[in-house]
Regions:
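Arg/Lys-rich, low-complexity, intrinsically disordered basic segments
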Residues: 1-101
């Protein structure tokens, strides 16, 4: 599988969308991140301690119900792009490396 791009979502309720190309040539697009809510990349621009606390709270809340091992799932994309590293660029690079995309 190959990550084609991550860009602003065309869904008015979501922040971003990721499009993947499967080995058979078909594409899959996943919209993720609730628009209007803050994430780690936003919190990290301000108080670093608050950002760490918000990240810990997010992870504790979402660990139960989210699929963080399927890179095409909204849960994995939110976890590894929005709640991983302080910048989206760094998180996307880590996401690609983590899932060999």
């Amino acid at each position: 599988m190959k990550l084609l791009f991550i860009k602003p979502s065309t869904n008015s309720d979501k922040k971003l969308m990721a499009t993947f190309e499967r080995y058979n040539g078909r594409t899959i697009t996943t919209h993720f991140g609730a628009k209007g809510l803050k994430d780690f990349t936003i919190y990290s621009k301000g108080d670093k301690q608050l950002a760490k606390e918000k990240k810990a709270s997010y992870l504790a809340r979402h660990i139960v119900n989210e699929n963080w091992i399927d890179p095409t799932s909204a849960g994995a994309l939110s976890r590894w792009v929005l709640w991983n590293l302080p910048t989206k660029e760094a998180s996307i690079a880590d996401f690609k490396k983590r899932f060999n995309l």
